[in-house]
Amino acid sequence: MSDLSSNRLPNRASRVTNQALSAIERFLHIEALSGVVLLLAAAAALMFANSEYASLYESFWHTPLGFNFGHFTLSWDLHFWVNDALMAVFFLVAGMEIRREIHEGALADFKQAILPIVAAIGGVCLPAIIYFSFNFNSGQIHGWAVPTATDIAFALGILALLGKKIPSNLHIILLSLAIIDDIIAVLIIAFFYSTNIDPSGLVIAIAGIALVLFFQWIGFASAWLYILPGAIIWWGLMVTGIHPSLAGVILGMMTPVLPTRTLIAPLTILSNAMQILQEKNTKTDLHHISTALKKMRKGQRDIIAPVTRIQKALHPWVAYGVMPIFAFANAGVSFANFDLSSDKSFLIVLGVVIGLFIGKPLGIITASYLAVKSGLCRLPPQMTWAGILLIGFLAGIGFTMSIFVSMLAFKDIVLLDSAKIGVLCGSGLSALIGLGYGLIYIKRNKKASHSSQ
């Protein structure tokens, strides 16, 4: 530490802080672009499902894939691997997002978090009530949670199309609302769509959680080591009867939000490595250069919290890989056998479409208005009720999360396809109206700013 200048640590700490602050910008950028990829994947699925290759499309996702470990065989079809295994990675990233937001984001300050929490609750309750009211007599009420979800990638993608004239607070509230929506969706899946609970599986899951805590206590920093306890939790939840993909949420919520060490040690490592590289005799000494670079990588890893480091690494893979694959595997709805003359199918479609397209924005703006008028919270700076309505329309884009819930709610293929069609129609309407209303919102804001000048 003696040869470390007095202002070097603060300067590096400042750069680290700036990197942390830019994390949300990277998140929004990735989510916005991935919305386009998701749309293309869904369009491709619909095209295949309604073409001469429909049978090939269906048979492909039922192709068995398995592994042999001695006398132990593990085999499921591709559809299962996508929906139950790959989606665990999605929920892992979602769990990390929730963990970070609770620790240092918009959900860290309860007063600041009240508005998106209340808005999210309103945006879940009213769509569920609307769906329930349409399907109460038809006996298909178990699909009530389908229109309650929000697809964060699509919602932020539409917001990105509107450009930089949208207030930053609107981005933050939409992101916070979507994350709270994810929390509610996880709770709904765990408590309402988990059947035939087997307590023996809980023992396995708890053993996996205990192994995570043991690894953290020992100080294991490599994310690869946590695949084993994550797999144990996944298996335990499946045996229990809870959807195994929720293992990702558990693992994500357990990821540390603080660096494993204080900043002084890794910053010192970085400083020493820089000094080695600056020495003249290292310019041609590959061994010293390699040593210095290894030290820099170690210092960089230790300076970043595990939740930030792992989420940054996984997020692009989830956004551009896991979610488009999920969309391609599940958005393929055949219109050939779809019959709106069936009361059950028609009411499911109607409940989902109106729940997403009308229930979401109406629930969000009503709950927000009541919370503000009662004094429970207040609108953030630069935020208007027009902005809250825009958030409501964008939150009506359920797409991937709504499809995921519909697959848990409906086992009958005809009813499942009806729910999926409702999701696609409701999400599409919400996206179009959200984009159109967003353009009007920008023009009004521009006129208001000119008149104020």
Swiss-Prot record:
<feature type="transmembrane region" description="Helical">
    <location>
        <begin position="114"/>
        <end position="134"/>
    </location>
</feature>
<keyword id="KW-0915">Sodium</keyword>
<feature type="transmembrane region" description="Helical">
    <location>
        <begin position="201"/>
        <end position="221"/>
    </location>
</feature>
<dbReference type="InterPro" id="IPR023171">
    <property type="entry name" value="Na/H_antiporter_dom_sf"/>
</dbReference>
<dbReference type="InterPro" id="IPR004670">
    <property type="entry name" value="NhaA"/>
</dbReference>
<feature type="transmembrane region" description="Helical">
    <location>
        <begin position="385"/>
        <end position="405"/>
    </location>
</feature>
<keyword id="KW-0472">Membrane</keyword>
<keyword id="KW-0813">Transport</keyword>
<feature type="transmembrane region" description="Helical">
    <location>
        <begin position="78"/>
        <end position="98"/>
    </location>
</feature>
<protein>
    <recommendedName>
        <fullName>Na(+)/H(+) antiporter NhaA</fullName>
    </recommendedName>
</protein>
<keyword id="KW-0406">Ion transport</keyword>
<feature type="transmembrane region" description="Helical">
    <location>
        <begin position="421"/>
        <end position="441"/>
    </location>
</feature>
<keyword id="KW-0739">Sodium transport</keyword>
<keyword id="KW-1003">Cell membrane</keyword>
<keyword id="KW-0050">Antiport</keyword>
<feature type="transmembrane region" description="Helical">
    <location>
        <begin position="27"/>
        <end position="47"/>
    </location>
</feature>
<dbReference type="GO" id="GO:0005886">
    <property type="term" value="C:plasma membrane"/>
</dbReference>
<feature type="transmembrane region" description="Helical">
    <location>
        <begin position="316"/>
        <end position="336"/>
    </location>
</feature>
<feature type="transmembrane region" description="Helical">
    <location>
        <begin position="249"/>
        <end position="269"/>
    </location>
</feature>
<keyword id="KW-1133">Transmembrane helix</keyword>
<keyword id="KW-0812">Transmembrane</keyword>
<comment type="similarity">
    <text>Belongs to the NhaA Na(+)/H(+) (TC 2.A.33) antiporter family.</text>
</comment>
<feature type="transmembrane region" description="Helical">
    <location>
        <begin position="143"/>
        <end position="163"/>
    </location>
</feature>
<feature type="transmembrane region" description="Helical">
    <location>
        <begin position="346"/>
        <end position="366"/>
    </location>
</feature>
<comment type="function">
    <text>Na(+)/H(+) antiporter that extrudes sodium in exchange for external protons.</text>
</comment>
<feature type="transmembrane region" description="Helical">
    <location>
        <begin position="222"/>
        <end position="242"/>
    </location>
</feature>
<keyword id="KW-0997">Cell inner membrane</keyword>
<dbReference type="Pfam" id="PF06965">
    <property type="entry name" value="Na_H_antiport_1"/>
</dbReference>
<feature type="transmembrane region" description="Helical">
    <location>
        <begin position="172"/>
        <end position="192"/>
    </location>
</feature>
<dbReference type="GO" id="GO:0006885">
    <property type="term" value="P:regulation of pH"/>
</dbReference>
<dbReference type="GO" id="GO:0015385">
    <property type="term" value="F:sodium:proton antiporter activity"/>
</dbReference>
